[in-house]
Structure formats: structure tokens, C-alpha cells
Amino acid sequence: MLNIYLKSKIHMATVTGKKLFYEGSIEIDEELMERAGISEGEMVLVVNVNNAERFVTYVIKGKRGSREINLNGAAARLAEEGDRVIIMAFTLSETPVKSKTIILNDKNEIVQEK
């Protein structure tokens, strides 16, 4: 039987920008994506720590090294610049999966990897 397991998590990212009139998505610095094991186009669950909003969107690759986390389209209404968010990707598997987590500071620099 297939179960849903956490695969990747970017913990406590800071929202750096918003583009309301865009197709939609969350734009993540390419380096952060790679370190967390998240792919472009992958579906993610985003939790806003500041206001408890939760939403599902897909990832687009941001500029490597920019440390930017940008919300686009309707998702831009669910967080403000400076809000802290948790970004999670999941996978289907018949056996438990060891997830990869990166923890960020308020400048979106990696302070810990698990």
C-alpha cells in the first residue's frame, strides 16, 4: 500500500517578495531547492507561521544564491514580505522515507541541515 511521506522541508523561510498578477507558484532560490531536494514544478504545501494560512502550489526556480522566496499569483494574498513559512514536499512510497530538512535564518541562509 502506498502512503504519503514528507520528502523535503524548508523550515522557517522568510518571504522576500510577492507578485500578485502572475500565473501562480512559489519561487525559491535554486540553491535552497537543491539542498532541500525540491524540484522545479513540484507540488508543495506552504504553511505561514505568522498567520496559520496553509496552501498548495508548485515550485519555480529562483536565481541561485539570491536567498529569495517569492509568492506569486493568488498565493501572494496569503503572506506578507517578512512572514516566516514552512515549505514541504511529499512523496508516495510503500516504505517510510527519510526526509531532508534545511532550517533557515531570517536572511534565508541555511543554519542547519537534517
From Swiss-Prot:
Substrate binds at T57, G73, A74, A75. InterPro entries: Asp_de-COase-like_dom_sf (IPR009010), Asp_decarbox (IPR003190). Pathway: Cofactor biosynthesis; (R)-pantothenate biosynthesis; beta-alanine from L-aspartate: step 1/1. It holds the Pfam family Asp_decarbox. Its cofactor is pyruvate. The active site is at S25, Y58. The modification Pyruvic acid (Ser) is found at S25. It catalyses: L-aspartate + H(+) = beta-alanine + CO2. GO terms for cellular component: cytosol. Is synthesized initially as an inactive proenzyme, which is activated by self-cleavage at a specific serine bond to produce a beta-subunit with a hydroxyl group at its C-terminus and an alpha-subunit with a pyruvoyl group at its N-terminus. Its EC number is 4.1.1.11. It is an enzyme of class 4 (lyase). Keywords: Autocatalytic cleavage, Cytoplasm, Decarboxylase, Lyase, Pantothenate biosynthesis, Pyruvate, Schiff base, Zymogen. GO terms for molecular function: aspartate 1-decarboxylase activity. Catalyzes the pyruvoyl-dependent decarboxylation of aspartate to produce beta-alanine. Heterooctamer of four alpha and four beta subunits. Belongs to the PanD family. PANTHER family: ASPARTATE 1-DECARBOXYLASE (PTHR21012:SF0). NCBIfam families: panD (TIGR00223). This is Aspartate 1-decarboxylase. The lineage of its organism: Bacteria, Thermotogati, Thermotogota, Thermotogae, Thermotogales.
